[in-house]
Design a protein with these regions (language model features):
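Gly/Pro-rich hinge or "lid" segments in bacterial periplasmic/extracellular proteins
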Residues: 16, 20, 97, 103-154, ...
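Solvent-exposed coil/turn segments that connect beta secondary-structure elements
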Residues: 17-18, 34-35, 43-45, 59, ...
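Aromatic- and charge-enriched surface segment that lines or borders ligand/interaction sites
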Residues: 28-70, 91, 172
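Ligand-site clamp/hinge motif
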Residues: 118, 147-191
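Surface-exposed binding/hinge segments that line
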Residues: 34-37, 41, 74-115, 134
Length: 201
């Protein structure tokens, strides 16, 4: 049910269509020669949807939460700890060099240190393209465009994510009531006219 969170949260870096790394929250980053210290510079123009600025403290908080087992979002077992050097600089100390770190950071959504708690999943605050408007548990999530998003404006003002079984999802696409639907390879031959099949493996 948390499929919507990548739309709500921003990441340090992202990957483009060619899987090359591009900056998101980071404006610059680099690694020490021994591969044990990564330094990320963070944008200064990013706000969470509650109006609080996003800083390197939030980045360190998010990474340390995963490292310490408080969030099981990604495998950061190669990381020792993260720390905010100042408001716009975060250092990540590694246990050992690891070339998968950037790929992992490209999917780790940064959460607000000041507002993260047990009920965060129900009322997420992020800095991404969208913000939560409504969540009907087990049925749907309604998102609306974040007017303060720092990047290019989203192409859709509103997104409704319906939670349904694969057959129902395909039927919704076939009837024209869904713009996007997930299906497995077994049903790939049933893609309705006007839709494009994307391999997201």
């Amino acid at each position: 049910e948390h499929v919507h969170e990548p739309l709500i949260q921003s990441t340090l870096i992202a990957t483009d269509n060619n899987l090359a790394f591009v900056n998101d929250l980071a404006t610059d980053y680099g690694c020490s020669e021994d591969g044990l210290t990564w330094t990320f510079r963070i944008r200064e123009d990013v706000m969470f949807t509650d109006g609080v600025p996003l800083t390197a403290e939030d980045v360190a908080f998010t990474i340390n939460g995963i490292v310490n087992g408080e969030a099981a979002e990604a495998d950061l077992s190669m990381v020792d700890a993260a720390r905010a050097v100042d408001a716009t600089t975060c250092e990540i100390a590694m246990k050992r060099p690891n070339n998968a770190l950037l790929y992992t950071l490209a999917v780790v959504g940064i959460v607000p240190a000041h507002a993260y708690g047990p009920d965060y999943g129900e009322r997420p605050i992020g800095s991404g393209r969208y913000m939560l408007e409504q969540w009907d548990r087990g049925q749907q999530v309604i998102l609306r465009a974040n007017p303060d998003y720092y990047g290019d404006a989203p192409l859709m003002d509103r997104v409704v994510v319906l939670f349904m079984e694969e057959d129902a999802s395909l039927a919704a696409a076939q009837s024209g009531t869904a713009d996007v639907a997930y299906t497995s390879a077994a049903l790939a031959g049933a893609v309705p006219a006007g839709y494009t099949l994307l391999n997201c493996a």
